Amino acid sequence: KGGIFQRIDLFEPGTLNVDPLLPNIADIFTTSTYEEYAAFGNATVHLGPRFDITLGGRYSHNKQFVDQGGTGLLAPPALESRSSEGVFTWSGAAKYKVSSNVALYTRVAKGFRPGGPNLLPPNVPAGTPQTYSSDSLISYEAGIKAETADRSFSIDAAAFHIDWTDIQLFTVINNFGLNANGGKAKSDGFEFTATLRPTRGFVFSLNGAYTKARLKTDTDPNVGGLSGDPLPFTPKFNVNANVDYSWSLGGDSEAFVGASLRSLSKQRANFDAGFGALYGLDRP
């Protein structure tokens, strides 16, 4: 159990000048403050030598304040935005030890991300979101953790399902890159990590994931996403391979060499409702 408190203050100055030889026609500033406090706790119940249940909870409350303004001929109109919200998140997990080297587990948890301001230049077109709201998710996971008796080989593997509500997305609206909310989404997949240590000093690891993440509902038309669209920047396949070898140089000195290889499948970029209309393209 415990508690935390954090406060983040951000100040973003800027100038607007059409010609270096002319005086500034606007001095612009954006001030943002984020304040949060939270209390949390976890408890584990041992139901015999092989079976454990762990429960956890966290309550947090955050406040945000955004102030944008400036001076000069083309200074933006004053903008003030305040938000305040509290949220309770939780988790529950069960683990069963098949043996001293093999364990099965399941886990379900609720997550949360606070909203915030979009830092934009002055006089943006109407309909450009100045702020974005919080989002939340519930994740479900089941997996296995196992290793050989001599620890020369180990593997972690899990399948997962995630349900999002009001998912935060990076998008382009009126030619400005910003954060917006996109309704409901889901993600299903599988991930694994395998590690091989055949000899002293030599380690080979391979990890990968398959993820199918899509919108469940249409977004706001300004965002440009439709139900069934893949989530941005989420490759379907992701594989990483790493190899390291270390050896002694005598005394306390060691040397090592290593190499890594990463492969990703293609992925969608951010949503942009105006891209197709601008270039005469149809949606796939």
Label the predicted regions:
Residues 1-2, 55-57, 92, 106, ...:
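Membrane-embedded beta-strand positions of outer-membrane beta-barrel proteins
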Residues 1-99:
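Signature of Gram-negative outer-membrane beta-barrel scaffolds
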Residues 2-18, 65-74, 116-125, 167-175, ...:
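Outer-membrane beta-barrel translocator domains and adjoining extracellular loop/strand segments
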Residues 4-6, 59-65, 108-114, 121, ...:
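Transmembrane beta-strands of outer-membrane beta-barrel pores
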Residues 23-30, 69-81, 124-131, 176-181, ...:
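Extracellular loop and loop/strand-boundary signature of outer-membrane beta-barrel proteins
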Residues 35-43, 88-92, 128, 138-142, ...:
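Hydrophobic, lipid-facing positions within transmembrane beta-strands of outer-membrane proteins
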Residues 49, 53, 161-163, 180-271:
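Gram-negative outer-membrane beta-barrel transporters
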Residues 97, 103-111, 131-190, 195-197, ...:
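Membrane-embedded beta-barrel scaffold of Gram-negative outer-membrane proteins
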